[in-house]
């Protein structure tokens, strides 16, 4: 009798492990303009106090060896989000990589296509000030990448003076 229970018990645990859904990890990605790792206390800054970021870093994965593909945010972000170098995305200014990468997935789109809820707050694909973003609209975003988009209402500003883009050189 005990042998039958032991076999039944073993089969039950085998079945649970075989048919259990694979564990999905929670993924939180934070990106910020002009924020270097040296500005966060989890990377050793003793002046700035960032306890919430520190707590996330202590419980998750903290990257310590990353490289920037562009010298300013448009090409760098497009490269990071798509996995392609700026010259391959054609993003050398502030525009979306989508026209150049076509139907190839961004990493956020890959998460979305695999059952994750992907959300972003404010702009990710820096395309100047996307139309409607100041009123809380979606702007000119990459809709295929997000389940939910939220833009805080508020104006962006530009520093006074003239600028020169590499595109016009």
What are these regions (language model features)?
Residues 7-8, 18:
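Cleavable N-terminal signal peptides
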């Amino acid at each position: 009798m005990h042998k039958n229970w032991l076999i039944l018990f073993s089969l039950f645990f085998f079945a649970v492990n075989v048919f259990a859904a694979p564990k999905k990890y929670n993924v939180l990605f934070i990106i910020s303009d002009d924020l270097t790792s040296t500005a966060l206390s989890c990377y050793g800054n003793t002046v700035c106090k960032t306890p919430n970021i520190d707590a996330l870093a202590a419980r998750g994965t903290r990257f310590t060896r990353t490289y920037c593909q562009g010298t300013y945010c448009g090409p760098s972000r497009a490269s990071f989000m798509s996995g392609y170098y700026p010259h391959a995305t054609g993003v050398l200014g502030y525009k979306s990589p989508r026209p150049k990468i076509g139907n190839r997935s961004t990493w956020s789109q890959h998460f979305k296509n695999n059952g994750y809820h992907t959300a972003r707050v404010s702009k990710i694909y820096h395309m100047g000030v996307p139309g409607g973003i100041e009123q809380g609209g979606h702007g000119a975003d990459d809709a295929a990448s997000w389940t939910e988009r939220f833009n805080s209402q508020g104006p962006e500003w530009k520093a006074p003076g003239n600028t020169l883009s590499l595109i016009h050189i």
